[in-house]
Amino acid sequence: MNAQINCSTRRRQEPATPLAARNLSAGYAAPIVQGVEIDLAAGTLTALIGPNGSGKSTILKSLCGRLRPLAGTVIVEGAELASLRERDLARTLAVHDTSRPSPELLTCRDVVEAGRFPHTGRFGSLTHADRDAVQEALALCHIEDICERNFATLSDGQRQRALIARAICQEPRVLILDEPTSYLDVSSQLEMLQMLRRLARTRGICIIASLHELALAQKAADHVIAVARGGIAFQGSAREAFTQEHMANLYGIDPSSFNPAFGSFEMERPRGSARVFIVAGGGSGVEDMRELQRRDVPFAAGVLHHGDIDWSLARALAVQVIDTPAFEPIEERAIMDAKAALEGCRALIWSLEDTGAVNRRNRDLLEHAKACNLPVYASATELFNGPELYGHAPTF
């Protein structure tokens, strides 16, 4: 009796958090990641992000037991992972990894049904409850219409859906997914992550998934863990994680190239002195700025209010941004700075459709451009293709 109690004490070390790691080091001949500390809550979706080769897959393999830790402990619902029997673990934890199985003579339904193995009896016969679970997983992953097709004939995206359906079919309390959105088109990526979010919330499942699509991770994840340089670089909520400083440190880029409002990186800004001045606001200049960047034309932008969509993008792409406090009429200082910048340019792009009380003074820039005999265009497309609204076309 005492031996059994002691054994239980060794296995049950702390309250039953769905999935945790304590001082985890993982790798092969040598550690790839070290000192990993993770606590994941039920009913949440955690995104694992980081550069290629940083150790995301290594962490996931260690969390599910497919790679033995070099040091530290993985804990599943309060029990050490190493102490759990394979079948018991499979009833609690399901995994989708990046391997690409190619079973012969099996239908898509057969592959999904394999997820019920931990719950079936000795002969592997499916009950009505098992078949209901299979059908629900097929529906969740939108593959009911292809479930009778040979798995080997499916596209990569269809196989991806089927393998995730197999993991869901296990009805786990912990779901580990390595790059679940790979091979999926944009619409399917959105559907998949929305489904996983609902699954976490409605069933109380703890889900952790590695994602390279940062814009999707920012929108879908309750919690974000960033992996870099041999360990956890930072972790926290999406709001805390997706900052310019964190993204710059994580991926080794210019901080201004990451746009937290869009959750995306921008291409490198053109170099050199500004040759075009853009007057924009409220998103009216987004396409014009991107067009100038694609053509490698340096530009200045203003006068933009703090927090405006165009202001956010201009900070990443423009060589100079003249701005003014949000919700306030444009300051005289900003107008003078903008006029000075405009005089050094060869053309003005007037992206605004209209002006109001707070940005009306931008019209001073339009008049100043005409006074300086600078050509004025309604868009970047017109600048490159003509005709100009005023003046003569510049040479770039």
Predicted features, each with a name:
Residues 64:
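Helix-to-loop junction immediately C-terminal to a conserved catalytic motif
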Residues 171:
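Conserved catalytic motifs of ABC-family nucleotide-binding domains
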Residues 72-80:
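Conserved ABC transporter NBD signature motif
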Residues 113, 128-146:
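Conserved ABC ATPase "signature" region
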Residues 125, 150-154, 158:
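Conserved ABC ATPase signature
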Residues 252-333, 350-352, 359, 377-396:
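ABC ATPase nucleotide-binding domains
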Residues 175-179:
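Catalytic Walker B motif of ABC-type/P-loop ATPase nucleotide-binding domains
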